[in-house]
Every structure is written in structure tokens, then in C-alpha cells.
UniProtKB/Swiss-Prot annotation:
Single GO term (MF): urease activity
Record bears the keyword Protein transport: no
Organism per entry: Pseudomonas fluorescens (strain ATCC BAA-477 / NRRL B-23932 / Pf-5)
Signal peptide: none
Pathway in which the depicted protein is active: Nitrogen metabolism; urea degradation; CO(2) and NH(3) from urea (urease route): step 1/1
Key words of the record: Cytoplasm, Hydrolase
Subunit details: Heterotrimer of UreA (gamma), UreB (beta) and UreC (alpha) subunits. Three heterotrimers associate to form the active enzyme.
EC number: 3.5.1.5
Protein name in UniProt: Urease subunit beta
Catalyzed chemical reaction(s): urea + 2 H2O + H(+) = hydrogencarbonate + 2 NH4(+)
GO terms for biological process, alphabetical: urea catabolic process
A GO-annotated cellular component: urease complex
InterPro entries linked to this entry: Urease_beta-like, Urease_betasu_sf, Urease_subunit
Length: 101
């Protein structure tokens, strides 16, 4: 084995198996690009992103950890969200929840 080398079992890896997901169209109404990370509470994203915010409460992007989605000014794209797991308590971000979902 080479230091840092990955030895991955053949086959598919399903992310967030069994969790509820939701697809939303999201538009950037601002004049700057907006990037949202994999574990950011989507409900609390930049206000220049327009979408069904209430539906996104308690959800994050359904993408691999450490990755992000970038929304260019004027761009609309469909994203898939997945429910937050664990104790379902949210602190920080934009400060809109600060406790239990």
C-alpha cells in the first residue's frame, strides 16, 4: 500500500440511503455567485437565492461531504435536498433557527 492510497471495495456507494429527499428549483436573483456547501442548512442560505424556503427547513444539499453547489447570477437550477439527521438541532449559520427543528 502507498501512503494516502485508497482501497475501495468495488460497487456503488449510496449516499443518505433511506432519508427523505426533496427536489427544488433554486434561482440566484443577486449579482454575485453564491456557493452552498454540502452540510449548510439550506433554509438559511443567502436571501438572494429564491426557492420554497419553508419546504427546505431541516434539509441540506444531497451531495457528497465537502462538496458544494455554485449558483451564478441569474441562474436557476434544480437541486436535491436531504433531511438533516441526528438530534435535528441547528445552531449558527444565519441564526434563523438556533435550536430544535
Amino acid at each position: 500500500m502507498i501512503p494516502g492510497q485508497y482501497q475501495i471495495q468495488p460497487g456503488e456507494i449510496e449516499l443518505n440511503a433511506g432519508r427523505r429527499t426533496l427536489r427544488l428549483n433554486v434561482s440566484n436573483s443577486g449579482d454575485r455567485p453564491i456557493q452552498v456547501g454540502s452540510h449548510y442548512h439550506f433554509f438559511e442560505t443567502n436571501d438572494a437565492l429564491t426557492f420554497d424556503r419553508a419546504a427546505s427547513r431541516g434539509m441540506r444539499l444531497n451531495i457528497a461531504a465537502g462538496t458544494a453547489v455554485r449558483f451564478e447570477p441569474g441562474q436557476t437550477r434544480e437541486v436535491e435536498l436531504v433531511e438533516l439527521a441526528g438530534k435535528r438541532r441547528v445552531f449558527g449559520f444565519a441564526g434563523r433557527i438556533m435550536g430544535d427543528l
